[in-house]
Amino acid sequence: MSATQDLAQHIAAIKADALPDWVFHEAKRTLVNILAVSISAQNAAPVQALTAWASDEGAKPRATVVGSGLRTSPTIAALVNGYMAHLQDYDDTHFPTVLHPTAPVWPAVLALAEDIGASGRDALAAFAIGAEVACRISMSVHPWHYDAGWHITGTAGVFGAVAAACWLLKLTPEQIANALAVGGTQAAGVREVFGSDTKAMHPAKAASNGLQAAKLAQAGFTGPDDVIGGRRGFWAVLSAAGHDEAALNGEFGKHWELANNGLKPYANGVVSHPLQDGVIKLRNEHSLTADQVAGIKVHCHPLVLELMNRPEPRRALEGKFSFQHCAAAALVDGAGHDAQFTDAKVTDPTISALRAKVTAEIESSYGEDEVRVVITLNDGSTVETKVDHATGSPENPMSDQALETKYTALVGAEFTEAHTNELLTAIWALDWAADVTQVTKLMTAKGA
């Protein structure tokens, strides 16, 4: 049996009742988080452009777009919602691989579940299974695939969307293998587009293409036996430097990678989160202001420089991928939320001047969420701190209360207080709902 066929067998065999309670709870946490960041992004210019395009397509109204409430086809809804979910880079992260599993999977699940009338519990289970597949695909090619320049959220994410949709549709193992082929050949996304509007198209297309692949396989589309492990398959072509086959199918259904997933406290690239923790801690402990600081030195994992070395960002999205801006904004504002990543903040004279004083030194022995921050003051004295695990990491997770605070801040800025609270209540109760419409109706500006 090929790697793809084995995976298809695992997906088909899992029953919702076999999922641990904590997995269902974590699935709800990811939905709280992803709807919060999506609703917060609804008025962004690229979202408006994408929504206008979706409206012009004139598709049969079967699924709901977050925010605007546009009703369109499931694949188009998945595309727009997948884009919104990742635009602000405020979605969750699978720490072993830096995959963002929710943005490509939940939009596909919500659109399909709404269309076919799936129960809330089945939607949660489908998400968990899809996220698991995306994480396992990622682990099977990490770090070689990412190092080659691929954006793992787009490439691995499509497999997760396929798996989730296939499970909801109750496809056979043969159909699932075919769907993985249809979706897998569309695995795409290059890291060159980081810091631009285009980056969020990766999970958007993954969600839409994955859902489409499942529907086509249901209709009889076929593919090769092993799109993942074949001679010219995913591993061979998109991860030529290496792969780990055991990471894909080992202990499937017994071990859940949602345990290694983290929710973001800051609205920027996750590898900068530990340095923001450190800078904010020192700022608050020593009442630091920008005019006192001669330099900020960050001792960090190599990935920080590889992904976030933009000393002079020009616009908001570039600021999200500038460790210099993240550190400077953290010291000036004591935060790293949406307000710290606007065009105005990126061009703010105080923050710009402080960015020029931020440097990094690679510590190859450090983990990806580990840093030491040293701040030198104008009088020559220094203050420093060590962060072993960033806030939001699996070792230092965001609590439900902290998640609700993040949710309320983001959604409350767009919806009324009553509407905000009603949606939150609906998400937490989704596992008892007959369908997902209690959520999809409330995730729009008009509400129920």
What is each residue range found by the language model?
Residues 103-111, 156, 160-164, 274-277, ...:
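Short amphipathic alpha-helical face segments that pack within enzyme cores
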Residues 99-103, 118-121, 125-128, 339-344:
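Contiguous domain-boundary segments centered on the initiation and propagation of an alpha-helix
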Residues 79-94, 101-119, 133:
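Function-dense linear segments that define catalytic or interfacial modules
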Residues 96-103, 151, 155:
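Glycine/serine-rich anion-binding loops at beta->alpha junctions
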